[in-house]
A protein has these predicted regions:
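Single conserved hydrophobic/aromatic residue that forms the stacking wall/gate
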Residues: 1-8, 13
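Membrane-interface interhelical linkers
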Residues: 9-10, 16, 47-73, 114-125, ...
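Juxtamembrane helix-loop-helix junctions in multi-pass membrane proteins
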Residues: 16-45, 164-189
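Hydrophobic alpha-helical transmembrane segments of multi-pass membrane transport proteins
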Residues: 16-20, 24, 53, 72-91, ...
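Helix-capping/transition residues at the boundaries of transmembrane alpha-helices
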Residues: 29-30, 89-90, 116, 173-174, ...
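Specific alpha-helical transmembrane segments that line the substrate/conduction pathway
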Residues: 37-48, 77-78, 86-119, 124, ...
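Hydrophobic residues within alpha-helical transmembrane segments
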Residues: 40-45, 69, 73-76, 103, ...
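Hydrophobic transmembrane alpha-helices of multi-pass small-molecule transport proteins
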Residues: 50, 72, 111, 120-140, ...
Length: 278
C-alpha cells in the first residue's frame, strides 16, 4: 500500500509538472527563441541540478560499460520526444498538442504486447479505442477545419519516442540502476542532440530579460528534472504500461494553462475529445 501511494503521488507530480511545458515555453517563443535554443538551456540547467542531488545523497556517478549504450539511446529518445513536441507548438495550440501526446500509453501497450508478449487486458483495449475516438474529435474542429498535419505528425513522433523510452527503461539493464543516475545521464546524452543541431544551424538564441531566464530555469526544474525523475522511478516500480496509463493529469494541466493564460479556445468538442483520451 505504501508503494502504491508513493507511485500515485509521483505520477500526480509528474503529470502536473510535465504539463507545465507550454506555460514556460510559449513566452520564450514569443520573445523570439527557437525550440532548439529553449531545449538546449532546459537540459543544460537540469543536468547540474540532478548532479547536485546525486552528490548530496552520496551516490556515485560511475556507470558500467553495459549501461552506456542504453543510456545514450534513452537520452536521444527523450531529446527527440522533447524536440518534436516543442516544434509542434508552432503548428497547433499547446493544449491540443499535449492532449494528442497522451496517445503514448496506447503505443506503450502495443509495444509491450507485440514485442514483449504482454497480454492486453480488455480494459486496456477499451481505453485505447476511447483514446482514438478522442483524437478523432480533436482532429476536426467545430468549424470544419482540421489540425495541422505537420503538427499532428510531430506530436505522434514525440509520443512514439517517449513510449519507446518508457519501455526501454523497464526492459534493459537500466531497470536496476538508481533513478537519479539514469535521469542524469539520459539528460546529459540527450543534450548532445541539441548541441549538434545548434552547431549545424550556427544560431543560439538567448533571453534578453531576467524573467525569461527564470522561465528556462523553471523548464529545467519542473517538466524536466522532476518529471523525468518521477517517470523513471515509476517505471522501475510498477512497469511501463501502468506508468503510461496513469498519466492522465498531464494533458489536463497543459490545457488548463493554455486556456487560462494563453487564451486558447475550449469548445464542447475539445472537452469531449480530452475526456475520451484521458
Amino acid at each position: 500500500e505504501i508503494c502504491a501511494c508513493l507511485v500515485g503521488s509521483e505520477m500526480c507530480i509528474r503529470d502536473s509538472s510535465y504539463g507545465m511545458n507550454p506555460l514556460f515555453a510559449l513566452p520564450l517563443y514569443k520573445a523570439g527563441m527557437d525550440p532548439d535554443s529553449v531545449l538546449f538551456f532546459r537540459y543544460l540547467f537540469a543536468i547540474p541540478l540532478l548532479g547536485i542531488m546525486i552528490k548530496a545523497r552520496g551516490r556515485s556517478f560511475k556507470i558500467q560499460r553495459k549501461e552506456t549504450f542504453p543510456l545514450i539511446i534513452m537520452g536521444l529518445l527523450v531529446a527527440l520526444s522533447s524536440l518534436t513536441l516543442f516544434l509542434s507548438y508552432n503548428y497547433m495550440a499547446a493544449g491540443i498538442a499535449s492532449t494528442l501526446l497522451f496517445v503514448y500509453p496506447i503505443m506503450v501497450a502495443l509495444i509491450m504486447a507485440m514485442v514483449f508478449k504482454e497480454k492486453l487486458a480488455l480494459q486496456t483495449i477499451v481505453c485505447m479505442l476511447l483514446a482514438l475516438g478522442g483524437i478523432g474529435l480533436l482532429y476536426k474542429s467545430e468549424d470544419g477545419s482540421t489540425l495541422s498535419l505537420i503538427g499532428t505528425l510531430l506530436v505522434f513522433a514525440s509520443s512514439l519516442s517517449y513510449a519507446i523510452y518508457i519501455v526501454g527503461i523497464n526492459q534493459t539493464s537500466l531497470k536496476n540502476v538508481a533513478t537519479l543516475k539514469v535521469t542524469f545521464y539520459v539528460l546529459l546524452f540527450g543534450l548532445s542532440l541539441f548541441v549538434a543541431r545548434l552547431l549545424y544551424s550556427g544560431v543560439l538564441n538567448t533571453p534578453d530579460q531576467w524573467y525569461l531566464w527564470a522561465n528556462l530555469l523553471a523548464l529545467a526544474v519542473f517538466p524536466t528534472a522532476i518529471s523525468f525523475l518521477c517517470t523513471t522511478q515509476a517505471v522501475q516500480y510498477i512497469g511501463s504500461t501502468p506508468t503510461a496509463i496513469l498519466g492522465a493529469l498531464e494533458p489536463v494541466t497543459a490545457v488548463f494553462f493554455g486556456v487560462t493564460i494563453f487564451g486558447e479556445s475550449l469548445t464542447p468538442r475539445l472537452c469531449c475529445g480530452i475526456v475520451l483520451i484521458i
